């Protein structure tokens, strides 16, 4: 127990002396600056030892400044510019048939009714003839569908009637055969019963006692 107390006192004294030395700013203490300087010097020596001369990279020629874009080149900025939608006093080449321009799109978005240009109804995508042809084809398809449905219903009704008549005919034949069989059985029963009646009549007659004879004088 005494030894344990002495050990505790020695540890406490050692810790107190360490704290006093740190508080007084002893030069022998640990400083972060010394560690940083030591690592930097080591790094410099390592770089000095391991550095090797490298082959200089190939120099690239400076890129030529891009000239003005050609008229045929596509530029996304042209699509965002509203002035490009105008004609700029240039006549656009005529395109065969009807077309859909930005003006038509603005009319639709603005709530106005779309009115195609006159004389442009015979193009690739528009025209009264195409609408008439589509209407006629739709009507023809509807009529064909109705006619096929009616034909299938009629065929089903005829086949059902034929099968019903066949079943009815088979049942009638079966009933006729059953009736003939019953009649035959009845005739056999009658024929078998007649001899029995005669035999029973003869048997009753034989069992009766003979009449008494009259007395003789």
From Swiss-Prot:
Its job: Plays a role in a late step of leukocyte extravasation helping cells to overcome the endothelial basement membrane. Acts at the same site as, but independently of, PECAM1. Homophilic adhesion molecule, but these interactions may not be required for cell aggregation.
Skewed-composition ranges (Low complexity): 50-64
Keyword Oxidoreductase among record annotations: no
Organism whose genome encodes this protein: Bos taurus
Highest classification ranks of the organism: Eukaryota, Metazoa, Chordata, Craniata, Vertebrata
Descriptive protein name: CD99 antigen-like protein 2
PANTHER family for the chain: CD99 ANTIGEN-LIKE PROTEIN 2, CD99/MIC2 PROTEIN RELATED
Keyword field contains S-adenosyl-L-methionine: no
Entry GO CC: anchoring junction; extracellular region; plasma membrane
Glycosylation sites: 134
Transmembrane segments: 142-162
